């Protein structure tokens, strides 16, 4: 990672995870009610579908780590999420979500409690969805693969060989490659490996793929969690497409960002993470 790049890793406990999932489920319920009333435009409908897929997958994963008695369905979480919204929006502004109340709620004897308002609890930088993993997080002993001036076949093989040496857990992959002798991009990838009983390893999650120019400026990013979304910045589509055209043998015409993502994920057997709906957008 370039010297001028820093990264902050945010640790969130299971209580906060439950609160976040429940709140997002409440947001989904609001989206669905708008949809029933035909009040959503096409981008809004797309966000509804993406949020629903993400929540269903995240809840399924989260429930595996919870005792059976604490596991909740999406519908149960929607109900809790709506209650959270009512608490946050319509009750005393100092009211907080259970387990995360402001100090004045935990200690009613606090003399400042009557004057408590949201201004006393400013947003915490870096804890919004758009801010998380803006730069892939630091990983101990990250793998760096240099693919400069390599042909497609050799590049594919080198990626597979290097990645297969990774241990179970998180990793970071840095790919450096010249594009048409004009632009040198650095691509950072975060992911998590799982080791199977038979000894095989697979990439269970691709958390984020970022592309930077020579000055370290973020020019494009692919975000892939439980579903895949494609976000472009400036001419990120064109640059990222150019980068991965080299990996698509026999592909003479420019490829779209969605197809690029499929090409990257296919190296790890993750084609299914791009839905047909997203492939059309």
From Swiss-Prot:
Q: Where in the cell is it found?
A: Host cytoplasm; Host nucleus
Give me the gene this protein comes from. Answer: NS
User: Chief subcellular site?
Assistant: host cell
Q: So what family is this one in?
A: Belongs to the influenza B viruses NS1 family.
Region listing for RNA-binding and homodimerization, in residue ranges: 1-93
Sequence motif: Nuclear localization signal, positions: 50-55
Organism, scientific name: Influenza B virus (strain B/GA/1986)
Q: Which purpose does this protein serve, as stated in its record? A: Binds and inhibits the conjugation of the ubiquitin-like G1P2/ISG15 protein to its target proteins. Since G1P2/ISG15 is an early antiviral protein, NS1 may inhibit the host antiviral response. Prevents EIF2AK2/PKR activation, either by binding double strand RNA or by interacting directly with EIF2AK2/PKR. Also binds poly(A) and U6 snRNA.
Protein's name in the database? Non-structural protein 1
């Amino acid at each position: 990672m370039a010297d001028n790049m820093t990264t902050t890793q945010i640790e969130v406990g299971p209580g906060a995870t439950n609160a976040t999932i429940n709140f997002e489920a409440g947001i989904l319920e609001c989206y669905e009610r708008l949809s029933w009333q035909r009040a959503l435009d096409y981008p809004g409908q797309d966000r509804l579908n993406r949020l629903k897929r993400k929540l269903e997958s995240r809840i399924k994963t989260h429930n595996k780590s919870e005792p059976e008695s604490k596991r909740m369905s999406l519908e149960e979480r929607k109900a809790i999420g709506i209650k959270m919204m009512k608490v946050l929006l319509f009750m005393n502004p100092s009211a907080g979500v259970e387990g995360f109340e402001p100090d004045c709620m935990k200690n009613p004897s606090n003399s400042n409690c009557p004057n408590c308002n949201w201004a006393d609890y400013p947003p915490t930088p870096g804890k919004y969805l758009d801010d998380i993993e803006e730069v892939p997080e630091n990983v101990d002993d990250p793998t760096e693969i240099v693919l400069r001036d390599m042909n497609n076949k050799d590049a594919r093989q080198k990626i597979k060989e290097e990645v297969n040496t990774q241990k179970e857990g998180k990793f970071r992959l840095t790919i450096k490659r010249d594009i048409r002798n004009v632009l040198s991009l650095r691509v950072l990838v975060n992911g998590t490996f799982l080791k199977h009983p038979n000894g095989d390893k697979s990439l269970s999650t691709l958390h984020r793929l970022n592309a930077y120019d020579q000055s370290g400026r973020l020019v494009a990013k692919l975000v892939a969690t439980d579903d895949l979304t494609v976000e472009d910045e400036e001419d990120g589509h064109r640059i990222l497409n150019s980068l991965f055209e080299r990996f698509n043998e026999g592909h003479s015409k420019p490829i779209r960002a969605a197809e690029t993502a499929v090409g990257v994920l296919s190296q790890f057997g993750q084609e299914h993470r791009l839905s047909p709906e997203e492939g059309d957008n």
